[in-house]
Amino acid sequence: MAEPIIEFETEKEFIDCCKWWKDKLGLWDWMIKFNLVAPNTKDMTINNTVCAGITDINFINKQAKIDIENNVGVTELTIVHELLHLFPQFIALESMAQTGEQIEELLDRFKDNIIHQSLESMAKAFIMVKYPNIDRSFFDIEMQYWD
């Protein structure tokens, strides 16, 4: 395929694309329910803004439900955008808003743990995009160096 998918022909094509991006973005441990929504059949608004995709996230259980409206632009791009909402930095931002800890401590934890994890996941994902013949098991080798 030479270009991103604008409109999915079948539910299987949609699910296959979602699974491909979930794998390439390193979201293996997330349980995600993907729904392809026909245009104008579901309320796709957030704060009075019409959206091409909506993600309902449970960070604690690493579960998400992602609704994607078919044929509202580059639908494959919407899939990637919605999946990126699952990256760890959003967890830290939520905890910053909800705790009484000193902001310096939260920022240190955010910088040292969450951002590092996010960058590592993204780096692996982009390597897999560049080298499509590898999968996530390729990175299991690096864990041997830490044992």
Question: Which role does the model predict for each range below?
Answer:
Residues M1-A2, V80:
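Polar low-complexity intrinsically disordered regions
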